[in-house]
Amino acid sequence: MAKGKKLSFSFHTYQDSVTGTEVVRLTPPDVICHRNYFYQKCFSNDGSKLLFGGAFDGPWNYYLLDLKTQQATQLTEGTGDNTFGGFLSPDDDALYYVKNVRNLMRVDLNTLEETNIYQVPDDWVGYGTWVANSDCTKMVGIEIKKEDWKPLTDWKKFQEFYFTNPCCRLIRIDLKTGEATTILKENQWLGHPIYRPGDDNTVAFCHEGPHDLVDARMWFINEDGSNMRKVKEHAPGESCTHEFWVPNGSALAYVSYLKGSTNRFICSVDPVTLENRQLTEMPPCSHLMSNYDGTLMVGDGCNAPVDVKDDGGYKIENDPFLYVFNMKTGKHFQVAQHNTSWEVLEGDRQVTHPHPSFTPDDKHILFTSDVDGKPALYLAKVPDSVWQ
């Protein structure tokens, strides 16, 4: 199929069999569809349109779904789209994404014209999700030396890659000129680069790998490469995962858990003082994301983590629910079942992961699940009781 092609969907609405919550399946369950990474912008500012990845014609491409007309427009074509890392610009006029692990592209959403903003040098490979600053004038990303790179198509390869100590660099790209600057270069696996919202001088990144082997996952560094600092000293047996900025920039939030314990905790760190706080205990969720000011958080119940080396120390019962946490009252709510399989599909480790986040008005939760067949997108209504 070609860019600009329209697809008509028929949304399917049902009530969750346990909670009674209204859930809407947005995409057909016979075609692989998934949301982008949970902290990347996927909704238009008014909440009426949704960016997603879909495999309607073989390759995984980007589509923009009009939630009012139930019609999706194809935005990209061909093979090689990183359909997890892309995002909508702050003014909703463009899509940014990486193609063929090498080309940073901008798609004009009015004309669908594509511009190649930056090309990864031949001896490097673009890795993971690249994130823009609040004004969308620059972006941080990770590149891995081409000779060190291996496709991470399952969790065994993910674990093995950690021990290779690949040569990685954290880069900053000027989105107007395409000029790239190296912030940090290390012979260590780097990932998850994220500008602090509203503060271009602070960049978060992680030491990637099995969570029980990484001695200190989360780091801050100034945009010019100075003042690199450890976000948290891990306690013995502690893993810290799935860090993200609260969208107003007030804190970096993350999940913490200990080997041999089924308890998990929502934690945060002050980006200025580096004070770490344990906010609340939670059910065994994998991913977390907050609303704009961090007053609500949403998580996806999960099974024992697959991204650890010694999985015998992390056995938990599978939890198939989405949870909302009211961070003011300390209460949490079982919203609906996602019932996803968490399985690797077509060489992708994350396409069946729920990756929940809120709609712009905080009234619904977007998530991915393969409960009805292939991965599809869903919206679950946030219960009124959450605000009480």
Swiss-Prot record:
Q: What induces it?
A: By galacturonate and polygalacturonate, and subjected to catabolite repression.
Q: What highest taxon heads this organism's lineage? A: Bacteria
> What job does this protein perform?
Involved in degradation of pectin, which causes soft-rod disease in plants.
Which of UniProt's keywords are assigned here? Lyase, Periplasm
Gene3D superfamilies of this UniProt entry? YVTN repeat-like/Quinoprotein amine dehydrogenase
Q: Which pathway does this polypeptide act in?
A: Glycan metabolism; pectin degradation; 2-dehydro-3-deoxy-D-gluconate from pectin: step 3/5
Task: Give the main EC class.
Answer: lyase
Q: Which SUPFAM superfamilies match?
A: DPP6 N-terminal domain-like
The record lists the organism as: Dickeya dadantii (strain 3937)
Which Pfam families does the annotation name? Pectate_lyase22
Q: Where is this protein found?
A: Periplasm
Task: Provide the protein name.
Answer: Oligogalacturonate lyase
GO terms for biological process? pectin catabolic process
Example GO molecular function: oligogalacturonide lyase activity
- Name the catalysed reactions: 4-(4-deoxy-alpha-D-galact-4-enuronosyl)-D-galacturonate = 2 5-dehydro-4-deoxy-D-glucuronate
Record's Gene Ontology CC terms? periplasmic space
